[in-house]
Amino acid sequence: MAGERIQAIALDALEIDALIDPAAATRALLESFERLAPFGPANPEPAFALSGVQAREPVAMNGGHVRCRLVGPDGAAVRAIAWRCADLPAGQALLSGQGGLSVVGRLKADDWNGRKGVQFEIEDVSDPRMV
């Protein structure tokens, strides 16, 4: 039984390139990693983890997407979106607004109306207290 659980965890493991704080999720960081493009199977796009964050101002959007701000313990925040997950455990964790979450995703350009920004595109969410 324990061996099966370990194998299942290993199959679901995500590769993470760096653990960062929301304050580090900047356009400058995104642009520095964009120099490594083009991305594909042999050169995956960098994945980042945020630890101990809270999903603030979560909104369920059309299509089951969840938009929020991920806020770290120091109050620094990054805009974030999780695609088609509102009905899944990851989406429910974001929509609950609970803190202490670990989030994995990728930085993406968020350019609108002449403003160049960045958003965190969420791939997975976990609550370490539930492991």
Language model: regions and residue ranges:
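Acidic, two-metal ion nucleic-acid-processing modules in DNA metabolism proteins
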Residues: M1-V131
